[in-house]
């Protein structure tokens, strides 16, 4: 690793549920907790509404890693959205491995509105994991090989 590589910081996109994870991130900011600033947050109504194509598009457009975070099981504002997200994520993760994307580049977690310290800890961990993988080089450019599988993942429960 040369000096330029040690200065490299990963670009991470975080899709956060409005009701829990985004509120946890907000509380972390208000509490002035320290965590890496290279995460770009996208607030979504529910983790269950995150289409797998959003994750792939983020990777295609230069993100080195993606974090999806929602409410804890049983606490979803929309009753079962986080369960749908967990099912989709499990399938998507296997598809990404199939096309050669390292599993650590895309991560899923639960964070409640009161868990500011947990949010900061997760951001530090995701950043360290993605940094250890290095810059994303091989990403999906042509979805034709997995388009059928991705459309199956997008089916609503």
Describe every region a protein language model picked out.
Residues 1-157:
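Iron-sulfur-associated redox domains of electron-transfer enzymes in respiratory
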